[in-house]
């Protein structure tokens, strides 16, 4: 019995060179073709589609980023121009208001000077009139005093 066991042990080792080895090789090759046709090609196609999608999305994102940066710089330039225009309008308004202030001040000063000059002329006229009246009264009083002195003698 032992000899039968030893005799049977020589078969069925690691590699048996009988019909199973080529059959296994054919099965592996056939399985490779089937997996390639049914699994690897569709998966590869999906991976390529996703890679194309990611690439196109990345390119679109770069274009949109460039467009956004361009729009941002345009808006910054427009804002800068608007600020400069607003500052120009403010400066012009300040200049106009300063000119109006100076004109109003000059007009008020001229009116005040005219009123003062008119008042001075009126005062001079009244003073001259009062002096003339005073001279006239002094003359009359002097004549009256002379008459009374002459009459009392």
From Swiss-Prot:
Q: Report the domain of life of the source organism.
A: Bacteria
Does the entry feature the keyword Cell wall biogenesis/degradation, yes or no?
no
The record's annotation in CDD domains points to: ATP-synt_Fo_b (cd06503)
Keywords noted in UniProt: ATP synthesis, CF(0), Hydrogen ion transport, Ion transport, Membrane, Thylakoid, Transmembrane, Transmembrane helix, Transport
Q: Which GO terms describe its cellular component?
A: plasma membrane-derived thylakoid membrane; proton-transporting ATP synthase complex
Which InterPro entries does the UniProt record give?
Answer: ATP_synth_b (IPR034679), ATP_synth_B-like_membr_sf (IPR028987), ATP_synth_b/b'su_bac/chlpt (IPR002146), ATP_synthase_B_chain (IPR050059)
Where is the chain membrane-spanning?
20-40
Cellular localisation = Cellular thylakoid membrane
Tell me what topology the record assigns in the membrane.
Single-pass membrane protein
Indicate the quaternary assembly: F-type ATPases have 2 components, F(1) - the catalytic core - and F(0) - the membrane proton channel. F(1) has five subunits: alpha(3), beta(3), gamma(1), delta(1), epsilon(1). F(0) has four main subunits: a(1), b(1), b'(1) and c(10-14). The alpha and beta chains form an alternating ring which encloses part of the gamma chain. F(1) is attached to F(0) by a central stalk formed by the gamma and epsilon chains, while a peripheral stalk is formed by the delta, b and b' chains.
What family does this belong to? Belongs to the ATPase B chain family.
Q: What does this protein do?
A: F(1)F(0) ATP synthase produces ATP from ADP in the presence of a proton or sodium gradient. F-type ATPases consist of two structural domains, F(1) containing the extramembraneous catalytic core and F(0) containing the membrane proton channel, linked together by a central stalk and a peripheral stalk. During catalysis, ATP synthesis in the catalytic domain of F(1) is coupled via a rotary mechanism of the central stalk subunits to proton translocation. Component of the F(0) channel, it forms part of the peripheral stalk, linking F(1) to F(0). The b'-subunit is a diverged and duplicated form of b found in plants and photosynthetic bacteria.
Q: What is this protein called?
A: ATP synthase subunit b'
As recorded in Swiss-Prot or TrEMBL, the protein's gene is named atpF2
